[in-house]
Amino acid sequence: SWRFNIIEEAAIGGRGGYEHFKDNGTDIFFLAQWFPRMVAYTDYAGWQHKAFLGRGEFTLEFGDYDVAITVPKGHIVSATGELKNAKQVLTAKQRQRLAQTNAAQPTFIVTPEEALANEAKQHQGQRTWRFSAKKVRDFAWASSEKFIWDAMLHEQPGAEYDQVLALS
């Protein structure tokens, strides 16, 4: 079994933690490099065992991830990969906006007005968001009831995928 305590980012800095907003009691959680994994092995140096010193990156292998993240019901989750259960976590209107995303201009999936209303509402229960990512170095995610979400298709002719969906 394994546990990971999420620490307030202001206390330690780094690549993960949470930020608490005292004015309304909400939080933003953001996590990168948050789970244990084997170190990388290279044919020229063997096992990579250098300590992480904060300026740089770990040596990581590429991998495939299928991740379920359970958060308070009002949270919007941003994560590496493709959202697999939009029907369970987004409203019908938000799913429609996501489906209509194009390369001409950004589209709000969660509007600023919806984010403000969501932030003010008292939510009960939890919701699980599911993501899948193929051939990536790491899996990172963020979660908050404060999030505004927009999306836009990015054209990349000649690449393995002609279009990718950019989310922020």
Q: What positions do the PLM features span?
A:
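A surface-exposed beta-strand-loop module
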Residues: 1-26, 115-130
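Enriched for extracellular/lumenal, surface-exposed ectodomains of secreted and cell-surface proteins
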Residues: 4-8, 39, 43-44
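Short edge-strand/loop segments of extracellular domains
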Residues: 17-38, 86-88
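Hydrophobic helix-coil surface modules that form long, contiguous segments used
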Residues: 40-42, 46-47, 55-168
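Loop-rich catalytic cores of soluble enzymes, especially ATP-dependent carboxylate-amine ligases
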Residues: 51
